[in-house]
Amino acid sequence: MAALRRMLHLPSLMMGTCRPFAGSLADSCLADRCLWDRLHAQPRLGTVPTFDWFFGYDEVQGLLLPLLQEAQAASPLRVLDVGCGTSSLCTGLYTKSPHPVDVLGVDFSPVAVAHMNSLLEGGPGQTPLCPGHPASSLHFMHADAQNLGAVASSGSFQLLLDKGTWDAVARGGLPRAYQLLSECLRVLNPQGTLIQFSDEDPDVRLPCLEQGSYGWTVTVQELGPFRGITYFAYLIQGSH
């Protein structure tokens, strides 16, 4: 039922992109790199420079900022967004966080990475993004979230964000989703937090996360509803 619900809601979840193309995603394999290259190459609606799956940064800053404040032992705090696409999560943290953050967004779509680097640096007719804290930084890298060896060493990030990436990867089979989770936990600091944002029901997602996150604490928080849809933040945390 949760999978069916995701497909039915898919067109309404695509913010800042071409809706006819977004609607066709319900019939596609969301683990297909070429699909996302085509999606990220679509013209944006109006002046919106980003494309958000589910929701944007503003809807979850109330959850993220307290976590950043609690984890100020590392300054700036290292944040990794896996499967960042052209979402506003990375740019929102960079431009709006009052706490110093070192944000890295990775995606397997070179089209998405090129778009976000252009947005960061200020492409034609655009102003470069300015940090919310003078010590903050933002970078984007072309990389597969299921193999982060070229991105980071073990335990190097204090906060990991996954907004819809598990959902997309799992469409290619649960073993791939578990590989994604394993890589995220490998590069996560033992005292850090991984957050998966999804509309998948807890009775479906929690058993998977508990199985794949042995030794970590798994909890869930309800988010929204946003535009009539309830979402969930699945938090996987080490010892604090």
From Swiss-Prot:
Question: What range does the transit peptide cover?
Answer: 1-28
Q: Which Pfam families match?
A: Methyltransf_31
Q: Which reaction does it catalyse?
A: L-lysyl-[citrate synthase] + S-adenosyl-L-methionine = N(6)-methyl-L-lysyl-[citrate synthase] + S-adenosyl-L-homocysteine + H(+); N(6)-methyl-L-lysyl-[citrate synthase] + S-adenosyl-L-methionine = N(6),N(6)-dimethyl-L-lysyl-[citrate synthase] + S-adenosyl-L-homocysteine + H(+); N(6),N(6)-dimethyl-L-lysyl-[citrate synthase] + S-adenosyl-L-methionine = N(6),N(6),N(6)-trimethyl-L-lysyl-[citrate synthase] + S-adenosyl-L-homocysteine + H(+)
Activity regulation field: Citrate synthase-lysine methyltransferase activity is inhibited by S-adenosylhomocysteine (AdoHcy) and oxaloacetate (OAA).
Q: GO CC terms on record?
A: mitochondrial matrix; mitochondrion
| Principal cellular location given in the protein's record | mitochondrion
Q: Where in the cell is it found?
A: Mitochondrion
**What SUPFAM superfamilies does this protein map onto?**
S-adenosyl-L-methionine-dependent methyltransferases (SSF53335)
State the EC number(s). Answer: 2.1.1.-
Protein name per UniProt: Citrate synthase-lysine N-methyltransferase CSKMT, mitochondrial
Organism annotation: Homo sapiens
Taxonomic placement: Eukaryota, Metazoa, Chordata, Craniata, Vertebrata
